[in-house]
C-alpha cells in the first residue's frame, strides 16, 4: 500500500484522477480522510479534493457560459420575431388596387403615420369584405356640387392610390440603412465604441429607418402597377371609341381582343360617378368621401374608416378620484386596480363609442361582388339602389379591431407587480444591511419579520400568476 499515493499523483488526465480518488476512498472507507504527517492517504485525499474542486469549477463555468449563450440566443430570436411582426404588419397596410370592395380598398390611404395604425389589419379587412365596415375610400381634398361629370371623372382619375410619403424624415437623418434586401444590419453598428445600451438604441433607430424605406418602396411598386394598368385601360378605351356601357355589351364575346386586354378590377366611369357625385365630409379629417360612410350609433355623425381605426381605449391607468387629494405614488397602489376605459364618442363624448355601416346593395363590387369594370348604375325605380336597411345593423367598437386590449392591461398589471416586488426586495435588503444596529437581540426578530414579508410577497405573486394562467387557459378553451 505504500506505493499507492505515488501512482495516484502520476496521471495528468482529470478522469484518471477521479477514478483513482474513488479507489482510494473505497479503500479507506471514508471520502473525507484527514491529512496527517507521513500519511499517504491524506495527501491523496487532498489532491483528489483539489482536482474535484477544479473540475466542478470548470463544469460550472461551462454551464454558465452555455446558459448565457442560450439566453442571448433566445433574446436575439425574440427581437427578430418582433421585427418580423412589425414588417408583416406594415405589409398588411399596403393599398393594392385589385383588393377593392364597393369602390374602396382594404388598406388606408395614408392620412396618418404608421405608429397610429396599430389596429389588427386582418380583422379590419375581414369586416370590410363582409360589408360590416366601410372600405378605405380614396378621399378628395375638396368637393363642389357644381362640378360636371367630366370634371369629376377627371379629378378622380388623377387621384393616387396612396398618399405621398415624407422620404426625408428628421428622425431618420444620418441613420444608416444598408442593403434593404438583407435582413442582417448589425454590421452598421460599431460595437467597439458604443455601449450595449447605445447599440440597442441605434439598432432600434436603424430598424425603423429601414422599415420606413421599405414601406415607401413597397407602396411605390403598387402605385406604379396601378398607374400602368389605369393608363393601359384608358388607351384601349380611347382607341376603341367605345364607352364603358358599350363595352359591357361585348362581355359575352370572349374573343374580343379589347376585353382580353382590359383590367376589369379598375372601376368604370359609372362607378366613379356613383361614388363621388354626392360627397360628404368627415368631421375629423375634413376630407371628402362617398356618402355611405360609417355612422356613430349615439349621434349619427359620419366617420371615415381611416379615422375610426385611430380611436382606441385609453392606456391602462388607475381610476381618477376627484375627492382624493393625497399624492400616493402609483407604485404603491394595487396593480389590480388598473383599468382601461372604452373610448368615448369624438363628437358627443358618449362612453363606449360604437359605429354602424349600411352598404348599398346595388354597389356591391370588387371582392365577393361584380367586377368594378362591369358595374351598371341602377334604374331610378330599382329597389336595389336602396341601402341594405332590412338587414339587422352590425355595431362595431374599437375593441372589435383591437381585441388584445385585455392582454395589454394584464401585462401592465404584471409589470407593476414585478416592480412592487423589486421595490420590496430592495427595501428588505436595505433593512438587512442598514447600519446603527446596537441591540443584538433585535436582529433575530427583525430578520424573521423580513423573511415573513418576503415569503408573503412571493406567495402573493405566485397566486396572481396562477390566476392569470387559469384565466388565459379558459379563454383559449372557450375559443
Swiss-Prot record:
Region named Disordered: 1-62
Biased composition regions of type Polar residues, renumbered to the chain: 32-53
Biased amino acid composition, Low complexity: 13-31
Highest taxon in the source lineage: Eukaryota
Main location class: cytoplasm
This protein's GO CC annotations: cytoplasm
Compartments in which it is found: Cytoplasm
Sorted UniProt keywords: Cytoplasm
Family: Belongs to the SIP5 family.
Role summary: May negatively regulate the SNF1 kinase.
The protein's name in its UniProt record: Protein SIP5
Organism whose genome encodes this protein: Vanderwaltozyma polyspora (strain ATCC 22028 / DSM 70294 / BCRC 21397 / CBS 2163 / NBRC 10782 / NRRL Y-8283 / UCD 57-17)
Gene of this entry: SIP5
Amino acid at each position: 500500500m505504500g506505493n499507492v499515493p505515488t501512482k495516484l499523483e502520476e496521471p495528468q488526465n482529470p478522469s484518471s484522477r477521479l477514478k483513482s480518488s474513488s479507489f482510494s476512498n473505497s479503500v479507506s472507507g471514508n471520502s473525507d480522510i484527514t491529512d496527517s504527517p507521513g500519511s499517504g492517504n491524506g495527501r491523496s485525499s487532498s489532491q483528489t479534493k483539489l482536482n474535484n474542486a477544479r473540475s466542478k469549477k470548470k463544469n460550472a463555468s461551462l454551464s454558465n457560459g452555455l446558459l448565457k449563450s442560450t439566453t442571448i440566443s433566445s433574446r436575439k430570436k425574440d427581437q427578430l420575431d418582433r421585427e418580423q411582426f412589425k414588417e408583416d404588419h406594415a405589409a398588411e397596410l399596403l393599398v393594392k388596387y385589385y383588393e377593392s370592395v364597393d369602390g374602396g380598398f382594404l388598406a388606408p390611404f395614408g392620412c396618418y403615420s404608421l405608429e397610429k395604425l396599430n389596429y389588427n389589419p386582418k380583422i379590419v379587412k375581414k369586416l370590410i369584405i363582409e360589408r360590416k365596415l366601410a372600405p378605405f375610400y380614396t378621399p378628395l381634398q375638396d368637393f363642389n356640387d357644381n362640378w360636371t361629370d367630366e370634371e369629376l371623372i377627371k379629378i378622380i382619375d388623377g387621384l393616387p392610390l396612396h398618399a405621398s410619403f415624407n422620404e426625408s424624415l428628421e428622425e431618420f437623418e444620418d441613420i444608416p440603412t444598408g442593403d434593404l434586401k438583407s435582413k442582417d444590419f448589425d454590421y452598421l453598428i460599431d460595437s467597439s465604441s458604443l455601449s450595449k445600451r447605445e447599440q440597442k438604441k441605434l439598432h432600434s433607430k436603424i430598424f425603423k429607418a429601414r422599415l420606413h424605406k421599405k414601406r415607401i418602396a413597397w407602396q411605390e411598386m403598387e402605385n406604379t402597377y396601378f398607374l400602368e394598368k389605369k393608363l393601359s385601360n384608358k388607351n384601349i378605351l380611347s382607341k376603341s371609341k367605345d364607352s364603358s356601357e358599350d363595352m359591357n355589351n361585348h362581355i359575352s364575346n370572349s374573343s374580343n381582343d379589347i376585353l382580353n386586354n382590359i383590367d376589369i378590377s379598375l372601376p368604370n366611369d359609372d362607378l366613379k360617378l356613383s361614388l363621388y357625385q354626392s360627397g360628404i365630409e368627415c368631421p375629423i379629417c375634413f376630407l371628402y368621401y362617398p356618402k355611405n360612410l360609417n355612422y356613430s350609433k349615439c349621434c349619427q355623425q359620419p366617420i371615415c374608416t381611416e379615422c375610426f381605426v385611430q380611436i382606441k381605449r385609453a392606456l391602462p391607468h388607475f381610476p381618477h378620484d376627484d375627492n382624493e387629494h393625497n399624492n400616493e405614488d402609483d407604485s404603491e397602489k394595487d396593480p389590480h386596480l388598473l383599468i382601461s376605459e372604452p373610448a368615448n364618442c369624438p363628437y358627443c363624448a358618449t362612453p363606449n363609442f360604437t359605429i354602424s355601416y349600411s352598404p348599398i346593395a346595388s354597389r356591391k363590387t370588387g371582392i365577393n361582388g361584380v367586377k368594378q369594370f362591369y358595374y351598371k348604375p341602377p334604374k331610378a325605380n330599382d329597389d336595389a339602389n336602396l341601402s341594405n336597411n332590412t338587414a339587422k345593423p352590425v355595431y362595431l367598437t374599437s375593441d372589435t379591431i383591437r381585441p388584445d386590449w385585455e392582454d395589454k392591461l394584464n401585462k401592465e398589471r404584471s409589470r407593476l407587480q414585478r416592480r412592487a416586488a423589486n421595490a420590496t426586495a430592495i427595501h428588505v435588503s436595505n433593512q438587512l444591511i442598514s447600519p446603527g444596529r446596537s441591540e443584538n437581540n433585535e436582529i433575530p426578530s427583525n430578520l424573521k419579520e423580513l423573511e415573513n414579508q418576503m415569503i408573503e410577497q412571493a406567495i402573493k405573486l405566485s397566486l396572481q400568476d396562477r390566476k392569470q394562467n387559469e384565466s388565459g387557459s379558459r379563454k383559449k378553451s372557450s375559443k
